[in-house]
Amino acid sequence: FLPRLFEGVESKMSFVTENVSWWFAKNGQDDDIVLSTKVTLCRNLADFPFIRKMTDDDKQRVDSLIYDAFCQEDYSFFYYDSLSDSAKKVFIDNNILWGNCSSVIINNKDDSISCLTNQSDHLKISVFSAGFECEKAAKKIYALDEKIQEKLQFAASMDFGYLTSNLCNCGSGLKISVRMFI
């Protein structure tokens, strides 16, 4: 099933390697000090165990459900295991992923939105922006989250909020970070 999803990966990879992080070239608030803003949401699908307890079948089903949620939009899909070493390095250098994984990487055209499946949580959504743009990036990620929730049901609790594999990420599942030039 997965190889069929990612036909043409090499042609899409030329986009990633030739046009690295278009969002970074844009101007942002206080961009002489704050180089970039990254807002991340961690989500897990309801009715699936957390990553450490998942079978390979579970992971494929999660990948498939997430693919279905994003395929109507203008995103590119990359299966980590099928990427060349240089393409993996591009994703690592762009702070999209780290280390070895077997994730599916989902990017929009300018790489300002990047998602990973089945790494530490079922879905990790990141929005990148040049400069100090926390509010702008947060609005963008929440809009995407609402759109995805029309198609996917996330694990949540009235007492604890969104459930994640890391207790620090439970609740809103939101993390905001900035990269600064000091």
Model-derived regions: residue spans:
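Long, Pro/Ser/Thr-rich low-complexity/intrinsically disordered regulatory tracts in eukaryotic proteins
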Residues: F1-D159, N166, L174-K175
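Short glycine-/aliphatic-rich beta-strand segments at the starts of folded cytosolic domains
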Residues: S172-I182
